[in-house]
Amino acid sequence: MSAEASGPAPAAAECLESPSPSSVEPGSPSYSLKPLTPNSKYVKLNVGGSLHYTTLRTLTGQDTMLKAMFSGRVEVLTDAGGWVLIDRSGRHFGTILNYLRDGSVPLPESARELGELLGEARYYLVQGLIEDCQLALQQKREKLSPLCLIPTVTSPREEQQLLASTSKPVVKLLHNRSNNKYSYTSTSDDNLLKNIELFDKLALRFHGRLLFLKDVLGDEICCWSFYGQGRKIAEVCCTSIVYATEKKQTKVEFPEARIFEETLNILIYENSRGPDLALLEATGGAAGGGGAGRGDDEENREHRVRRIHVRRHITHDERPHGQQIVFKD
């Protein structure tokens, strides 16, 4: 009788059983956790919803937190589907596993992703990967302070290629003494040198934000050009012809304040979306001094170039006695 009574019990128990674990998503909370099967050579990992299937040999090959988990030193619990649950982001766990298999992995290019991977490597105590990530981040930080390289323009075509290949605003200094047909005034050589020295100082100060070009083949003697988003925004010409004696002379000026002003103005074009029109107006931007009315066409205004030809009054000491000074651009 006891045998008959016990007969239908398994069937009844079977009817009360939950659905097969294979039909439920890994990590479902409807199942209680249980210890990992000790004799298994393979491990199913659920890391923050990212599923991975690997071997115990991979997980225990290096002295990491994963080795401590799967070498028997720490009890590891699985869900009903046999998945080991790890409460971490699974975004970089595949990279962690590849490093444990091969001893090296290609690292992300992004500094942000490198930092994320470094955080995961520290959590899992993967010392070799920690060192690789730290070295890569250090190299990226060093690249953030780039070398101060100043290309020298050798042709108009090369200049256009340089302008098209950079997203930075551009400052170009053209200086070419061989263009002079006349003698220089007494201060011209000194002023030409001052322009070159200022260009070098600006390049050292702003080379991370601006591209500096040097042109020694152009048609001017000394001229600054400022470019934003591939087009010329302003130009400061530092030379003029002086009729001070019986012969013409070339005068080179050093408009330091104007050069500083235009350099700061061109920084507005660092933003890839272009300068703010209100800021452009406030700084005298493309309007070239604010003389134009608000009714001017905005597109024409954007494409104007501020051309400043320096004209400084000659002091009494520089003016030859009895001679009238005439400037001609």
Curated annotation (Swiss-Prot):
Q: Which GO terms describe its biological process?
A: cell migration; negative regulation of Rho protein signal transduction; positive regulation of DNA replication; positive regulation of synaptic transmission; proteasome-mediated ubiquitin-dependent protein catabolic process; protein homooligomerization; protein ubiquitination; stress fiber assembly
Limits of the BTB domain? 41-109
Q: List the residue ranges of the region (Disordered).
A: 1-31
Pfam families according to UniProt: BTB_2
Please report what switches on or represses expression of this protein. Answer: By TNF-alpha.
Q: Is Amino-acid biosynthesis among this UniProt entry's keywords?
A: no
MF (Gene Ontology)? identical protein binding; protein domain specific binding; small GTPase binding; ubiquitin-protein transferase activity
What function does the entry list? Substrate-specific adapter of a BCR (BTB-CUL3-RBX1) E3 ubiquitin-protein ligase complex required for synaptic transmission. The BCR(KCTD13) E3 ubiquitin ligase complex mediates the ubiquitination of RHOA, leading to its degradation by the proteasome, thereby regulating the actin cytoskeleton and promoting synaptic transmission.
The family note in this entry says:
Belongs to the BACURD family.
Q: How does it assemble?
A: Homotetramer; forms a two-fold symmetric tetramer in solution. Interacts with CUL3; interaction is direct and forms a 5:5 heterodecamer. Component of the BCR(KCTD13) E3 ubiquitin ligase complex, at least composed of CUL3, KCTD13/BACURD1 and RBX1. Interacts with RHOA; with a preference for RhoA-GDP. Interacts with POLD2 and PCNA. Interacts with SPRTN.
| Protein name as it appears in the record | BTB/POZ domain-containing adapter for CUL3-mediated RhoA degradation protein 1
- Organism equals Mus musculus
